[in-house]
Each structure stands twice: as C-alpha cells, then as structure tokens.
Amino acid sequence: MRLLLFATITVLGMSQALLAQGSDNHWEFGVRAGVVNYQGDLQRALFTAEGSRPAFGAILRYSYGNHFALRGSMELGNISADDADSDDLRARGFSFESSLFAGELTFEYVPFGKELYSNGIFNSQLNPYVFTGVGFAVADAEVSTVNPADAARFPEEDDQSAFITVPIGGGLRYSIASGISVGVEANWRPTFSDVLDGVSVNGNPDAMDWFWTFGGYVSFTFGADDDIMNLR
C-alpha cells in the first residue's frame, strides 16, 4: 500500500501545481488501441499470446511547459486465462474470462521535452516519457472448471469486482505535425488483490494479480494558441 500512497500524493501535488500555471497550458484528446494481458493464478508469465486480448481507450491530457502533464484515461477490454495453456497448471483445469474497464489519473514526466516551435517554424520531436498515478478497475471474473466437482468452489467468499490500481509505465511520443502526436506505451497495474481472476484460496492467495496494456495512440491539441503549442 506504500506504492498506492506515494502515487496518490504525487498526482495530487502535481495536479495542483499544473492547474495553477499560466497561459502556456493546453489540452489534448486522444484515442488508443492495443492489447491487454493478465498475470495471476492462472497465468504466471507476464505475457502470453494466448492471454492477449484487444483493448481500446481514450485520453485527456493537460500539458504544461515541455516536461510535465496530467492525464486522465479510460480503457475497455477483456482478460482471460486457461490452465490448459500451462504445463504446470493443466491438471487443475481452471479457466476464467472477464470484461475489464479501467480508469486512471496519472502524472507524466517528459525528461527531454523541448518547444516544437522556433521562430514560428515547427520542429517534430521523438521523446520518451514515464508516468505513474492512481486508478481503478472493474472486472467480474467467471471461473470455469474441467472437473464438475470443482464448480462448487466458485465464486470464492472474498470475490470482488472493483479494484484500486497504481498505473506505472512509459512510452515514446512523436509529434508528426502541428497539433497532432502519435505514440506507443506500456502500462502495468497492480490491483492489490488476488481475485481479479476470481481465483485466490483455490490458487496462490499470497500473490496479487496484475494486468497490463501495450498499444498505440493518436492525440490532437486544443485550448492553446498556435504559436505556443508545445506538443511532445
């Protein structure tokens, strides 16, 4: 929970500072698409092709200067895993599937950001960035079993459908034209829970579940004068 407390303090402090800044501020709206993957009791690996599912989302970004931004985002997708895909777990015979909705507020740092306009001339840039923040996820896992006798174990007593998350990630952002940027990013989220997949006491209750996304996006600037747009 120290990670959650640190992320909350960071986002609240930086959001107050950013919103108090002056006229250089601007907004961006973007859409993104990629894949979502899960790690937990039914999938120990960080990534598997079998567990990858499409994910889609939207981004609203408030930028100040060349190095900092506050971003709200949402994402929709599905997560799933099957013991049959793992040599170690195949004999157990569990599988799960769930829709997933995630929302978050993150602070973004662009270490090498520069102004894109020099004497009125646009200069494209490619910049790495990192981010962290606070968020939530909503998932309602449905567990299936190969052995009919195991079906009575689910849903588990501590089953839940809402989770607190701490998004941690980074990406690359390329400003391709005035007011337009594209990028790719990866985002890891611990859920501080072991029931994202609906399996805890019937699996490994000491290890929390994660999910992560990887994908690309395009964003468009608004709320800024043309000569002060500082896309990164």
Language-model segment annotations:
Residues 41-46, 89-96, 117, 152-158, ...:
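Extracellular loop and loop/strand-boundary signature of outer-membrane beta-barrel proteins
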Residues 68-146, 220:
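Gram-negative (and chloroplast) outer-membrane scaffold detector with strong preference
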Residues 25, 50-54, 99-103, 124-126, ...:
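Residues that define the transmembrane beta-barrel architecture of outer-membrane proteins
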Residues 1-25, 223-232:
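Cleavable N-terminal export/targeting peptides
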Residues 100, 176-232:
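Predominantly the C-terminal beta-signal and adjacent terminal strand-loop region
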Residues 31-35, 58-62, 105-109, 132-136, ...:
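Residues on the lipid-exposed face of transmembrane beta-strands in outer-membrane beta-barrel proteins
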Residues 24, 65-67, 112-114, 123, ...:
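Outer-membrane beta-barrel channels and translocator barrels
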Residues 20-61, 141, 215, 219-225:
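Short glycine/proline- and aromatic-enriched beta-strand/turn motifs that initiate or cap beta-hairpins
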